[in-house]
């Protein structure tokens, strides 16, 4: 880390594509291809963040996000370490804050979420915790709702997929759909589908 000039910081991360200029060293003979520096770089050049795509009129913005094993413990501040997610409440808070900022920044109408704790849709569930935080973002105006898959775990794996939508922009059309239990039910992450229609009119989408 020393050649970057300042320690790595989650609030100011180095983007993929960043470069080091005028670097010299010897490649380690081991399997990790580690570089032993003989001369530090002249400069570290941060990659430019690309501009987000412009929101087009009469369109619905659908975004997908891998939540990287988002587990919220027991939903009341305890229940750590979790099966696959955060080791303690502090680790969850770091993960939670980053995810909420990222999801809010997408300005989506529909969110398709992956690697979410499979603990139902109740008030203490991981999905409820995440949507409560999104609804607290001023720009969201409390508009986020989850597609209801019932109170029980969805599929038999420890993590699941889920969908959420903004009620001020789209409406679910019909009931959600998923495969019936069968050979694919063991240890799976059951797929989920839902049709939506824009609030201001337009063609439905699935």
Language-model-detected regions and their locations in the chain:
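Divalent cation-coordinating acidic motifs and surrounding scaffolds
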Residues: 3, 7-9, 13-19, 31-206
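OB-fold and OB-like beta-barrel modules that bind single-stranded nucleic acids
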Residues: 20-28
